[in-house]
Curated annotation (Swiss-Prot):
Main location: nucleus
Disordered, as annotated region: 1-22, 138-168
Encoding gene, per UniProt annotation: LSH5
Name of protein: Protein LIGHT-DEPENDENT SHORT HYPOCOTYLS 5
Annotated PROSITE patterns: ALOG
Length: 182
């Protein structure tokens, strides 16, 4: 009975892909169309991180996020009082999610070694980081990566004993000392 249920679930999931899988397929097809329309047309095997960056910049023309230029009087204001002529661009979160889906799609089609995945290129990661920082500054909400606080560490040092764990027998014990950081 359980096997039938699992088989039905697998069949239904294979007949109608999840929202994520559908979006991933649409994104992949859009990227392949971009490569075909590129001058000169590009083959996926020759695609590099630089081509991915061109694609991301191409997508900016379809963006809906106002990104104030540094010369704009509203630069750094989270809620500007009126309209300006600054460009609309793709939001960083959208680009980040897109790259994640395209990276997964590339791996699924067997695009080669993970090192050859153009969506995982260092230049793409750097570009996304710059977009995130630029958009945060333009909105007046600077993105500061939270630094991990060093936890108060206790160090444990064993004290030699006879190895017997019975109470009061002089067995091995741990002495905990608080480490101080200066």
């Amino acid at each position: 009975m359980e096997g039938e249920t699992a088989a039905k679930a697998a069949a239904s999931s294979s007949s109608s892909p999840s929202r994520y899988e559908s979006q991933k397929r649409r994104d992949w097809n859009t990227f392949l169309q971009y490569l075909r329309n590129h001058k000169p047309p590009l083959n996926l095997s020759r695609c590099s991180g630089a081509h991915v960056l061109e694609f991301l910049k191409y997508l900016d023309q379809f963006g809906k996020t106002k990104v104030h230029a540094t010369a704009c009087p509203f630069f750094g204001q989270p809620n500007p009082p009126s309209q300006c002529t600054c460009p609309l661009k793709q939001a960083w979160g959208s680009l980040d999610a897109l790259i994640g889906r395209l990276r997964a799609a590339f791996e699924e089609i067997g695009g080669g070694l993970p090192e050859s995945n153009p969506f995982a290129a260092k230049a793409v990661r750097i570009y996304l980081k710059e977009v995130r920082q630029t958009q945060a500054k333009a909105r007046g909400i600077p993105y500061d990566k939270k630094k991990r606080k060093r936890p108060h560490t206790d160090t444990a040092t064993p004290i030699a004993g006879d190895g017997d764990d019975a109470e009061g027998s002089g067995g091995a014990a741990l002495v905990v000392t608080a480490a101080t950081t200066v």
